[in-house]
From Swiss-Prot:
Allows the formation of correctly charged Asn-tRNA(Asn) or Gln-tRNA(Gln) through the transamidation of misacylated Asp-tRNA(Asn) or Glu-tRNA(Gln) in organisms which lack either or both of asparaginyl-tRNA or glutaminyl-tRNA synthetases. The reaction takes place in the presence of glutamine and ATP through an activated phospho-Asp-tRNA(Asn) or phospho-Glu-tRNA(Gln). GO terms for molecular function: asparaginyl-tRNA synthase (glutamine-hydrolyzing) activity; ATP binding; glutaminyl-tRNA synthase (glutamine-hydrolyzing) activity. It catalyses: L-glutamyl-tRNA(Gln) + L-glutamine + ATP + H2O = L-glutaminyl-tRNA(Gln) + L-glutamate + ADP + phosphate + H(+); L-aspartyl-tRNA(Asn) + L-glutamine + ATP + H2O = L-asparaginyl-tRNA(Asn) + L-glutamate + ADP + phosphate + 2 H(+). It holds the Pfam family GatC. It is an enzyme of class 6 (ligase). Keywords: ATP-binding, Ligase, Nucleotide-binding, Protein biosynthesis. GO terms for biological process: glutaminyl-tRNAGln biosynthesis via transamidation; regulation of translational fidelity; translation. It comes from Geotalea uraniireducens (strain Rf4) (Geobacter uraniireducens). InterPro entries: Asp/Glu-ADT_sf_sub_c (IPR036113), GatC (IPR003837). Heterotrimer of A, B and C subunits. This is Aspartyl/glutamyl-tRNA(Asn/Gln) amidotransferase subunit C. Belongs to the GatC family. The gene is gatC. Its EC number is 6.3.5.-.
Length: 95
C-alpha cells in the first residue's frame, strides 16, 4: 500500500498537527515503509491458526476482597484545617 504526502497531510490536519514540508516528506516515507512491512504479513498463510487476543493465557491478577476496618472519622479529619461535622470543609471553587 502506497501512502501519499496528501494523506499524511490529511492525517496531520485531523490530529491538529502542523507539519513542515520536510516533516511531511519524512513522515510519508516512514509511513510508506511501515505499511509495506505490514503488507508483508498478508502473505502469511494463516489457515488453521486460531485467532487469539493474547499470546499467553491471561488470568485474573486481582486479590480477593477483604473487609477491613476503616481509619475512622476522627483519625481521617484529625489534621484537617477545616471541617464541617464529619466532612472536610474546602474553599468554594465554583463562582
Amino acid at each position: 500500500m502506497k501512502i501519499t504526502k496528501a494523506e499524511v497531510e490529511h492525517v496531520a490536519l485531523l490530529a491538529r498537527l502542523e507539519l513542515t514540508e520536510q516533516e511531511a516528506e519524512t513522515f510519508t516515507g516512514q509511513m510508506d515503509a511501515i505499511l509495506a512491512y505490514v503488507d508483508k504479513l498478508n502473505e502469511l498463510d494463516t489457515d488453521g491458526i486460531v485467532p487469539t487476543a493474547h499470546a499467553v493465557p491471561m488470568e485474573n491478577a486481582f486479590r480477593a476482597d477483604e473487609v477491613t476496618p476503616s481509619i475512622g472519622i476522627e483519625n481521617a479529619l484529625g489534621n484537617a484545617p477545616k471541617r464541617a461535622e464529619s466532612f472536610f470543609r474546602v474553599p468554594k471553587v465554583i463562582e
